[in-house]
Structure formats: C-alpha cells, structure tokens
Amino acid sequence: MRKKAVFFDADGTICDMKKGTPDSAIEAVRALIDNGHEAWLCTGRSRAFVPWYLEQIPFTGMITACGSTIEKDGKRLFNKEMTPEIAKLSVEVLRKYGLIPVMEGADYMYYDKDEYTDEVNWYASLITEALGDKWRPIRGNEDCMQINKSSAKMTAGCDAEAALAVLSEYYDIIRHEGSSSFVGNTIELVPKGFNKAVGIAAVIRLFDIPWEDTVVFGDSNNDLAMFEYAATKVAMGNASPKIQELADHVTSDMFHYGIRDGLRYLKLI
C-alpha cells in the first residue's frame, strides 16, 4: 500500500479532557507508524495545551492552533502569532460584550482564573492542571501576550454577535453546534486565512506528500476545513452532523475502538 499521512484531531477524536487517550488509540497509532505511514496531530489546541496524554502518542509531527503552528520531530517549523495589540483588543472586546477570553499561544495560555472558572466550563480547572507552568494570567500581561488564537466562552446575556462584528476583521470564526461537553459554549477565533486544512496543505507541500494520500479523523466543526480538503475522511461516532455528512466512513467513538477500527477499515493497520 502507498504511504499515507493520517491527520488526527485531538478532543473528541483521540483524547478526552477527563479520561485522556485510550490505550487502543495509542496502540493503533503505533501500528500505523510501524506500517510505514505518518501520523500527525491536527488540533485546534495551541501547542502550549498539548499535555502529557497527547505527548505520549508517537506522532510524526503536530499541527496546532488550527494550522497556526507546525512542528516535526520536536522542531517548530512555523508559528503564526497575532500582534500583542490585537491580542489586547480581543480581550477588551470580548469582555465588553460579556464573553470570557481564553488566549491561546504556542508557549503559554492566558486567562484569569477568577473569570474562567468551572462554572463557565466544567473542565476549566483541568485545563489549568494540564497546563502547569504554561498558564499565565491575562491580568498583568495585557500588553505582551503571545497568542495564535482566542477562544470566546459565551455566558448568559452575552452579545456574541456584537463582539464578532468587531473581531471578524482579524479572525476567522468557528462556531460549534449543540452543547457538547467540550466545545458547546465556545466560539473559536483563528487568524484570518488559517485553519486545519491550511496546516495540512503546508505539511504535504513541505514534505512532498501527495494530496491523494491524505487521511483525516475528526469529530467537531473545527474539523470542517480539513474534511472539505482531505482525500479520505473518517468521522468519529460522536461527530457533528456536518462532519458525518462529509465523511467517507463513520467509525465508532474513541472509547469503543474508533481509531483502531477506522484505521483497520482503511487497511492501514
């Protein structure tokens, strides 16, 4: 079989905020690589928010922050950052309209713990724990944040449309469907022109990978761009309706051997 480059989303696909990554998924990725293929993480998380349970997976490389950062073999090859001025403006606009800013960078994530709490997202303290010394408060760093993207947490009474009307000059907007446990009340703000597909396109150009050998696994609407781009698309069993519509195959969820079974279906392991 031709060598394939397989790109895996993180949350909801190959890891869970509470449970980490199932052993079956780790073993499947190892088998994929042993068979001569490439395995890439392709996540909306910024590089700072790639914790131990993702680091333990032997990925060929990582595309993080929706295409804003690319690394291979532990070496950072590309890192698109918003200017500190736009980062500061983003915080001010989101707060003005009642949204909570979480600012995501390759080296640090920035948010204020008295503002971004478990009452806003049940997993907020888990993020803080996973980040360790890669967490920074916004307070005191307003003028020097180094970020790739932002996440806006919606709260009761917020005016998200007013905030996005201002910030859409600088960001592309990703809206999530429904009230899933991880992304239901989050709006992602990604640098203009960047998404997971852009990251994948850059990787295959850099490393001479034919487009027809690209495979993606994903579940949420921040995977839409890569599902519209890649040659072969596998949706997880818990995927959003839009992702399932675009998929060539729908596997089960990660805790019911979805990664393993999806790779077996494609005859890659």
Question: Residue ranges of each PLM-predicted region?
Answer:
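Conserved acidic, metal-coordinating active-site core of Asp-based
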Residues: L99, E104-F217, N221
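Residue immediately C-terminal to the conserved phosphorylatable aspartate in receiver
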Residues: A10-D11
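Mg2+-dependent phosphoryl-transfer enzymes with acidic/Ser/Thr/Gly-rich catalytic loops
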Residues: M1-A5, P22, T186-I269
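A general structural motif
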Residues: M1-K3, G36, F59, G98, ...
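Short hydrophobic/aromatic-enriched beta-strand-loop microsegments
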Residues: F59-C66, I174-H176, K233-G237, T251-S252
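Active-site phosphate-binding/coordination module
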Residues: K18-A124
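Short, structured coil segments at secondary-structure junctions
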Residues: I57-P58, C66, E169-Y171, Y229-A230, ...
